Amino acid sequence: MYKRQLVGSFLLALPISSATGEAVPYIDALFTATTSICVTGLVTVPTYSTWSVWGQIVILFLIQLGGLGVITVMYGVMMGLHRRLGLGNRWMLQDVFNLNNISGIVRFLRKVLIGTLVVEGCGALLYMTVFVPGYGLRGIWISIFNAVSAFCNAGMDIMAEDSLCGYVFQPMVNLVTMLLIILGGLGYIVWWDVLRVLKNIRSQKLKCFRLLTLHSKIALTVTGILIVVGATAFYIFEYNNPLTMQDYTVPQRIWASLFQAVTTRTAGFATIPQEDLTNTSAIISVLLMLIGGSPVGTAGGMKTVTIAVLLVSMFATIGNKEDAELFGRNIPKQAVNKSVAVVSMFFIIASLSTILLSVVTDADVIDIVYETVSATATVGLSRNLTSMLNLWGKLIIIVTMYLGRVGPISLVVAFSTQKKNKNIVKNPTEEISVG
């Protein structure tokens, strides 16, 4: 992944990529390439005014590459060249996508690519109903860019410096953006599982939710809970905030609260200035950013299923139960171990990044935590700190974004390798005290 990151940075550092024709400083080109391929959305320079159309095309390609995953895009290229996918890549994709066998890998990837293009295309067409009247022909490019960025949970746009704050009350922009974010964040496994169930519903008249896999049940349930609880919390704590929602009507508060609850789940778009949020809302946003979206999707974060498994395991331990159960099914020990590893990794990365960033900047602690968690969970929301970072601050965030995106994937591969190569000889067990 770092090779594509470097290639992208070199392309963005070319004068042709700059709107002024003068080369952008390499550190900003590297930062932009990293935030694009990691689908984060934090930017040190305004995307809409700094980059030329060519530069924006490079950014969009990196976003699509990062959102879909390198192997998925590679398959698309190989399919176009009529080449076959290697057995090693098939095994890795089986683990990453959590499929039962490798026989359906090619078919699944084809569905992912086609489904992604269809959803992004529909989103772009809906955006055009708003952006073309407002921006003319340029609105077509803006619509395409926003659709890909929203679906890939990147949160980058080419309209203005204040993201979507000018569209806080625009129903179409709000609905399309939230829908694309949610669809991308739910993950491809949930997509096809829901479609499979809907087909069975038509033919067998069975209850929909009961037919879903455990993975889909957890992802959909946790996603719904986080959106409702998050939106309610933002509505309450921003109700009397003169800098955000105090002067809004009730419907406008609902729109703004819903969008904030959705976008903090690793999207990065904003309809209200993040630096104007109350400290309580900022802390809630940090928690939502850490949780993120669902596995095998375009979102980042620790993932909804990971948090659910960890909580269920915790309550099972407290209740002195041998197995963690959810929706009438036992959670595999391997899933519990993986969840602990992912959560631990995220907290370590975010903590170290926060400490290091606090050394090189004198910003408020809440702003630093917001920035580092946003980078770790590849969200892209900032309390106006990113553009003020010095060289060391930019390097810290670049590394944080990279680790936050690559780390979970590396853990999945590590656990899958461990599963296939179990040690026959084990060391003796000895009890220790914890807690």
Explain the meaning of each model-derived region:
Residues K3-G435:
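Membrane-proximal intracellular helices of multi-pass ion channels
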